[in-house]
């Protein structure tokens, strides 16, 4: 396969895989009764995975503006998935906290990713796993540095 054809195939694969993951996960969440959008689920995930989840740190993790995050957080607060609490150490700061209502959503989300990765690596040999990881790390580094 020549380089130009390989680039086209790789581009097509990345676009298709990205879209498939989002749509399949959205469907899996809907089947479990979750009415949140994938964007809202990813905001919940970012809050859960951020050490000190304030507006700035969560927006940075998601690579969105604080204004965009504010809109999402307002919706998630109204839906009962997130609360805002004053930082006990610095009253000027507002921390974001998931409510118990978010726990099953995060469990479904995590289980989807666990199943997806298990399926991807199930038939790969160790050297293929390592090659896949190395390729994806290179791709991730490119996106992180370029954008």
Model segments located where?
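Terminal interaction helix/tail motif
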Residues: 5-8, 12, 17, 111-147
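N-terminal helix-turn-helix DNA-binding core of bacterial DNA-binding proteins
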Residues: 23-65
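Regular, well-ordered alpha-helical segments
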Residues: 19, 23-26, 78, 122, ...
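Residues within helix-turn-helix
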Residues: 55-56, 67, 74, 94
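Short amphipathic alpha-helical/adjacent loop interface patches that line ligand
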Residues: 14, 40, 62, 73, ...
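N-terminal leader segment of winged-helix/HTH proteins
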Residues: 1-34
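Charged, amphipathic alpha-helical coiled-coil/dimerization segments
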Residues: 75-131
């Amino acid at each position: 396969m020549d380089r130009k054809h390989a680039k086209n195939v790789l581009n097509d694969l990345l676009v298709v895989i990205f879209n498939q993951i989002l749509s399949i996960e959205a469907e899996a969440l809907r089947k479990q009764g979750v009415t949140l959008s994938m964007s809202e689920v990813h905001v919940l995930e970012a809050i859960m995975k951020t050490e000190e989840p304030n507006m700035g740190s969560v927006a940075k993790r998601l690579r969105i503006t604080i204004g965009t995050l504010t809109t999402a957080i307002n919706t998630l607060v109204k839906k009962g998935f997130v609360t805002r609490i004053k930082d006990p150490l610095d009253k000027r700061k507002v921390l974001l906290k998931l409510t118990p209502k978010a726990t099953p959503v995060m469990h479904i989300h995590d289980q989807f990713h666990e199943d997806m990765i298990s399926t991807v690596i199930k038939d790969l040999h160790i050297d293929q796993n390592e090659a896949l990881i190395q390729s994806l790390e290179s791709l991730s580094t490119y996106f992180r540095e370029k954008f």
